[in-house]
Regions:
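Hydrophobic h-region of N-terminal signal peptides that target proteins for export
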Residues: 6-17
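Short sequence/structural segments immediately N-terminal
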Residues: 17-246
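Positively charged n-region of N-terminal signal peptides that target proteins for export
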Residues: 1-4
């Protein structure tokens, strides 16, 4: 009987989902906050899109997420102050770009990226706008204030239009996202398979210029972003009109 229970335990453990197995870094840091110099770092990760989608600590920090042995888990990890660390400010775009390919490609075209490379980490990087681990999306007003840090009247590169333009464009991105957010539920109610497929295709086609607009935002080429947002809005509105007229 004991042997059967032990075998059952092994089956359950080895069959644990990847989410449970991939959280060992966070499990240990959350369980031992007194040993963590910045426990809020782990809490922010857990509540973030990264945490919800099981993008574990090792994806950015390296290390071994398969063990609870502290020495082995932290082997190879470098402090973010080390220029060789994947979380050093200069290296963050490449680290984030392993998953966020589109934004990384566009960011490399920007003056921000040039400044980051030229200044050896003193220029703006991913965490400047998105935070360290929370991967947050700033509100339009928060984005305007962040842009004003450098581009306001007292900033290192004053530009009276840059910050308000960024706020307005992010508001437009959010507006298009809200339009599209209603579509999947309505499409799901369509009974005719042919019409449903056509609507699903139209939904995907509306998403394309929206993604392109968000990507181009990372190059800070606002004219291109406006053009892509215009296309996304037109396609989204056409889709919703079609859904309203069965």
């Amino acid at each position: 009987m004991r042997l059967c229970l032990w075998l059952l335990f092994l089956v359950v453990v080895t069959a644990r989902p990847l989410r449970a197995q991939g959280d060992r870094c966070a499990d240990c840091h959350i369980a031992n906050p007194q040993a963590d110099p910045v426990p809020e770092h782990t809490y922010d990760w857990e509540a973030s899109a990264h945490g919800r989608n099981v993008v574990g600590c090792e994806k950015c920090h390296d290390g071994d997420a398969t063990t609870f042995e502290s020495f082995l888990a932290h082997r190879g990890i470098l402090t973010s102050r080390n220029p060789a660390s994947p979380t050093h400010r200069t290296n963050l775009p490449q680290t984030c770009g392993k998953c966020h390919i589109g934004p990384f490609v566009e960011f490399q075209k920007s003056r921000h990226y040039q400044l980051l490379r030229e200044s050896r980490g003193e220029g703006p990087t991913c965490s400047t706008c998105h935070g360290a681990v929370a991967a947050r999306l700033l509100s339009p007003r928060s984005l305007e204030k962040r842009c004003d840090t450098c581009h306001g009247p007292d900033g290192v590169h004053p530009n009276s239009d840059f910050a308000p333009d960024g706020r307005i464009l992010l508001q437009e991105v959010n507006a298009v996202r809200e339009l599209l957010a209603t579509a999947p539920r309505l499409i799901g109610r369509v009974k005719d398979p042919v019409r449903k497929k056509a609507l699903e295709d139209a939904y995907e086609q509306a998403q394309v210029p929206l993604r392109e607009a968000v990507h181009s935002a990372h190059a800070f080429v606002f004219d291109q972003m406006r053009e892509r947002l215009k296309a996304a809005k037109e396609r989204s509105e056409a889709l919703l009109i079609e859904l309203a007229n069965p």
